[in-house]
Design a protein with these regions (language model features):
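Short, well-ordered beta-strand elements
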Residues: 28-38, 79, 94-98, 120, ...
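Ligand-site clamp/hinge motif
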Residues: 190, 218-264, 300
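Gly/Pro-rich hinge or "lid" segments in bacterial periplasmic/extracellular proteins
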Residues: 68-70, 169-226, 230, 240, ...
């Protein structure tokens, strides 16, 4: 039996405009978020192992590729996602070529080029830097910039998820500005880590430790300046405090709400709730070396004996989705045609 999964849903109270009653956010406005559960260890994603920082960094840093809301890989700083079909991946699958957009500038006005990508790669694999993981980058045998807008990577061996890891959504580290960071033996303690210069839609203005991080719209952003002038991310570890600040209007939006607090959030007048799928799976894994569990009928009987829907409803207050695979239900890899195993204790007994 395929391991069963419960897909919980995150609560995102409106990056696109959820607010307290009577508040309208238009161009030139400021949004205050309860977006960080703890103090970041660094604002440089290369040196961070915290989910908050890695997710938050996409606001001010840039990557070669990113994922859309269906988990499809799409280009960001790269002009296109390298594939066999478009020639970005060689027939032997050992050479990957990226063509960099020519209209991208760092937040200080300098152009972002292929040399920045090569520099950032060398920073990640530098053993002196305290990088959490080098998965994907460790597979690189050689890398070179061809002019200002082409990066050619040669792999040591075939590594199918390489494009997802190399300055992509699964990897560690964003593209960093060589002109600001060259010459350091390591990057562990440079001032850049507290106020990075990136190429994302917003730029870091101020980090008030223990309180908040303030970002301003980047007027040089290659997709155009964001319509929201300023974002303030409050650092609020206690979920109940986050809830009360949403209720009082001290914050405009609240991400990743604990499902146990969902009934209280729903009771706040004027608050819009957006439920978005996240890859948060709860499942049982079977030890197939066990003689009993090696029998598919035993595994199926166990699955049929668990009332997953009741568990899911109780745990998520109706915000979860029951799925029958180990992939998010909105992703390209999810197989919606799988026949669900339904709760059936009597049927389970007949299998044994």
């Amino acid at each position: 039996m395929t391991p069963r999964a419960l897909l919980s849903l995150a609560l995102a109270v409106g990056f696109a405009g959820c607010s307290q009653p009577g508040v309208r956010h238009t161009s030139g406005s400021k949004l205050v978020f309860s977006g960080l559960a703890g103090e970041p260890d660094s604002l440089n994603p290369m040196l961070s192992n915290e989910a908050d920082t890695l997710n938050f960094s996409h606001l001010y840093m840039s990557y070669l590729v990113e994922n859309d809301d269906r988990n499809d890989t799409i280009p960001e700083i790269a002009q296109q996602v390298p594939t066999l079909a478009n020639g970005g991946i060689s027939r032997d699958q050992l050479t990957v070529t990226y063509h960099i957009r020519r209209n991208v500038r760092w937040q200080d006005g300098a152009p972002l080029t292929a040399l920045d990508v090569v520099f950032s790669y060398h920073a990640i694999v530098n053993p002196r830097n305290n990088v959490a993981t080098r998965v994907g980058y460790a597979e690189v045998g050689a890398i070179r910039a061809v002019g200002n807008d082409t990066v050619v990577v040669r792999l040591r061996r075939r590594f199918s998820p390489f494009v997802q890891y190399f300055f992509g959504p699964q990897g560690v580290g964003a593209i960093m500005p060589a002109h600001l960071l060259e010459g350091h033996a390591d990057l562990n303690r440079v001032a850049y880590n507290a106020r990075p210069v990136g190429a994302g839609p917003f730029q870091i203005v101020r980090w008030t430790r223990g309180d908040s991080i303030t970002l301003a719209a980047n007027p040089l952003y290659w997709r155009g300046k964001p319509r929201i002038d300023r974002l303030v991310y409050r650092i609020i570890p206690d979920p109940n405090t986050r809830l009360e600040q949403l209720r009082s209007g001290e914050v405009d939006a609240y991400f990743d709400v604990d499902p146990q607090l969902l009934p209280q959030v729903r009771s706040i007048p004027g608050v819009h709730i957006a439920l978005t799928p996240v890859n948060d799976l709860h499942l049982l894994r079977f030890n197939l070396r066990d003689p009993a569990l090696g029998d598919v009928n035993v595994r199926r009987a166990i699955a049929m004996s668990i009332d997953r829907q009741t568990l899911l409803s109780a745990a998520t207050h109706g915000s979860g989705v029951l799925i029958d695979a180990d992939q998010p239900s909105n992703g390209w890899a999810y197989n919606a045609s799988l026949s669900p195993i339904r709760y059936d204790p009597a049927g389970a007994k007949r299998l044994l």
